[in-house]
């Protein structure tokens, strides 16, 4: 056996390992973009939670913000709205579920649909809801519209009361309430 034949196996082994390593790197470079595209994009991550300053919202008025591509109604209700919503018996409602992500499975009483203040008291003053009709996804009109002093969806005639509960029309459910909480006296965190 000559000296050249001893090196042939070593050269062959080197070429085999170098080719295999190159194949692994090329495969990884080709597969990584496919895996990485499944991660949430920066705009989705940014919209997961937002903070809304409600210090300028006067009693009896409403603020609409965009969250996750949908309108969110933030209403600071007056005493008349609160009394009207709390006077409705549960049996008079078409949907008796609160549809509140903060209180899953709760009944649709006014207290279960409103947002407690930063100190934990729930006076019923703050109501935060997705502004999307549960019938076909239209945006209801606010400013105490409709027959029940809440919201009215002009697309197909759904009427919601001052707590966002369906009272009349084709909508099957109450307006949804997103995960929300006060983080201080004047700031609400959505999501």
From Swiss-Prot:
SUPFAM superfamilies, sorted: ISP domain (SSF50022)
Domain of life of the organism encoding this protein: Bacteria
CDD domains assigned: Rieske_cytochrome_bc1 (cd03470)
Transmembrane segments: 18-35
E.C. no: 7.1.1.8
One GO cellular component, as annotated: plasma membrane
Keywords noted in UniProt: 2Fe-2S, Cell membrane, Disulfide bond, Electron transport, Iron, Iron-sulfur, Membrane, Metal-binding, Translocase, Transmembrane, Transmembrane helix, Transport
Keyword Flavoprotein: no
Protein name in UniProt: Ubiquinol-cytochrome c reductase iron-sulfur subunit
Gene of this entry: petA
């Amino acid at each position: 056996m000559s000296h050249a034949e001893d090196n042939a196996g070593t050269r062959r082994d080197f070429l085999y390992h170098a080719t295999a390593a190159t194949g692994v790197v090329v495969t990884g470079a080709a597969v990584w973009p496919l895996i990485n595209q499944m991660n949430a994009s920066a705009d989705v991550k940014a919209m997961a939670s937002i903070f809304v300053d409600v210090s300028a919202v006067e009693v009896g008025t409403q603020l609409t913000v965009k969250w996750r591509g949908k309108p969110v109604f933030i209403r600071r209700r007056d005493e008349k709205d609160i009394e009207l919503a709390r006077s409705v018996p549960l049996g008079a409602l078409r949907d008796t579920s609160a549809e509140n992500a903060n209180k899953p499975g709760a009944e649709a009483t006014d207290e279960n649909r409103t947002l407690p203040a930063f100190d934990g008291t729930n006076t019923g003053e703050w109501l935060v809801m997705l502004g999307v009709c549960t019938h076909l996804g239209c945006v209801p009109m606010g400013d105490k519209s409709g027959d029940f002093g809440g919201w009215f969806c002009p697309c197909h005639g759904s009427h919601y009361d001052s707590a966002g509960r369906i009272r009349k029309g084709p909508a099957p459910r109450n307006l949804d309430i997103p995960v929300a909480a006060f983080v201080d006296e004047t700031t609400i965190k959505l999501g």
